[in-house]
Structure formats: C-alpha cells, structure tokens
C-alpha cells in the first residue's frame, strides 16, 4: 500500500511538527520547579513540585502511520527528559529503516535507539523493565503489552484501534452524511483507526 506523499506530509510529518511547536514554548515552564503551599503544622517548611523523567520509554508504533505514532510520542518523551527505545512495525520496513537511519545519524545513540523486527523482537523488548511503554495498535497485542508491563509495574499508554461506528439520525442531511462517510471509509484507503467502519 502506497500512501500519497501529500497525506504523509499533512497527517504524519505535519502533525509531528505541530507537536514539537506546541512543546517548545512550554518546555521551560513544564521543567520548572513550582512552589506548593504546605500544611500549617509543617511551617516553616517549603514545598516544591519538581518534574522528573521516568527513564527509558519504549514506543511501539503501527504500520499505517509509522512516522506520526513513532515521532510524536518520542517528542513527548524527550520533552519529559526520557530516553527512547523505538520499535516500529515490521509491516512498514522501508519507513522503519529510514527512521532508524535518521535516529542513528542525528540522535545520541546512548539515549535513543530503534529496534527493527517482528513479533519475536517485540516479545524480547517487552521482557525488559522499561519505565514507560507507549503502544499504538490493535487490542489483541495491546493486552499482551499490558500483561508484559504488569510484570514490572511499568506504566502504559495504549492507543488502541477498533470499530468506528457512525450514527446518522433523522435530523441529518443524508447527502452530506453519505459523502463524509464515504470519504472517511475510502481515504488512505480506510486505514486509520478513526475512519468509519464500512
């Protein structure tokens, strides 16, 4: 399946750049210490909230939007001060190879790595005690990720696909609804998880 270049630019690279633009002006405030009031019995103590990195985040991304769901959570992990191990889908080998080359070329290899491969490599990664796991994909593998993370009490972010039903009631303009549903189900061709189920 060949994704149109314009869609990749808009729906993947563009959204990653939007995320970075959102993070950049806020990063100093997010990283700053914030004073917190203390209970009067603890006076004259002073309290602070300090953001700290979790450590190493594992990002497991899908084949349908590999750039978006690899680099957007990577930008978030970096903004939080974390290292990243990225596992792109084996079903998008060319894109995964380009991402691996870019990260090896421009990022510190002590802090950022890409592991390519299939289910066997993913299983080996899930045996490791990561500090956070971000997974985008189906519910079946999501439950495997969750079970593996539970062994180490690793926090998990799951962005799971599924059915996207469409409800059209009697007040809807049927011509408009039909066009929108047809567009959503046939663009790219219907690969994103948020497209209506046809």
Question: Where do the PLM segments sit?
Answer:
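Short gly/ser/thr-rich secondary-structure transition/capping motifs
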Residues: 36-43, 114-117, 180-181
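Residue-level signal for inorganic ion chemistry
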Residues: 20, 81, 112, 133, ...
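Conserved small-residue-rich beta-alpha loop and adjacent elements
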Residues: 38-106, 110, 153, 175
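A structured beta-alpha segment of the ubiquitous adenosine-cofactor-binding alpha/beta core
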Residues: 46-48, 113-131
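N-terminal Rossmann-like NAD(P)+-binding subdomain of aldehyde/semialdehyde dehydrogenases
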Residues: 1-48
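ALDH superfamily catalytic-core signature
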Residues: 107, 140-198
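Hydrophobic/aromatic ligand-binding patch that stacks against planar heteroaromatic rings
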Residues: 59, 76-77, 124, 148, ...
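Short beta->alpha connector loops at strand-helix junctions that form conserved
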Residues: 82, 87-89, 116, 136-137, ...
């Amino acid at each position: 399946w060949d994704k149109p270049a314009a869609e990749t630019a808009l729906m993947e690279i563009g959204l990653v750049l939007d995320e970075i633009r959102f993070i950049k002006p806020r990063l100093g405030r997010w990283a700053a210490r914030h004073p917190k009031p203390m209970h009067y019995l603890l006076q004259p103590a002073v309290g602070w909230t300090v953001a700290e990195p979790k450590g190493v985040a594992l990002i497991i991304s899908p084949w349908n939007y590999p750039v978006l769901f690899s680099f957007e959570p990577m930008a978030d992990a970096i903004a939080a001060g974390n290292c990243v191990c990225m596992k792109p889908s084996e079903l998008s080998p060319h894109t995964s190879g380009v991402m691996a080359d870019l990260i090896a070329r421009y990022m510190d290899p002590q802090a950022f790595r890409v592991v390519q491969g299939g289910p066997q490599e993913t299983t080996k990664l899930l045996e490791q005690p990561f500090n956070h796991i971000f997974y985008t994909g189906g519910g079946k593998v999501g439950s495997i990720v969750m079970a593996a993370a539970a062994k180490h009490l690793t926090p998990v972010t799951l962005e799971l696909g599924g059915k996207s039903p469409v409800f059209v009631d009697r007040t809807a303009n049927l011509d408009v609804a039909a066009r929108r549903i047809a567009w959503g189900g046939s663009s790219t061709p219907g690969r994103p998880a948020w497209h209506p189920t046809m």
